[in-house]
Amino acid sequence: MKTYQQFLTEASLWDWMYKKNKAIFYRGESSSGKGMGIGMLGLGIYLTWSDSMAQKFADKQTKGVVQSFKVKRGLKMADNTSKDFAKAMANLGRKPWEWSHSKEFSGFLTGELKQLGYDGAYSDNPAEGIVIFDKKNVKEIK
């Protein structure tokens, strides 16, 4: 069972980012809506709180654009430095910092985190950003 301090520490960064950005995050993608396909934190829609970082990802795409998205309130998000994230990675035979460019690996990581009750994952690095596993939990802002 988590201590009160662990709960505060794990929840606070995501909560802070969510409130600071008023639930609005950015995505650099191709004009057809495709991202880079790296999948470091699992499979889903990747976002960042940095519009300049999103622009860098857009610049690497064919006819890249930056889109804004509103993220649904109340999602349970895994910090990539948390014990739960480490547990999910350990279940896949990896250390928390060891990741793969494999889509299959990203799919397995997503499954592990979903089994632990998470809707997505995040890093404190704007290049790694945030992944929301289910697109129903984000809405594009036109």
Go through each PLM region and give its residues:
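Short acidic, low-complexity intrinsically disordered linear motifs used
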Residues: M1-A11
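Active-site and NAD+-binding cores of ADP-ribose-processing enzymes
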Residues: A11-K142
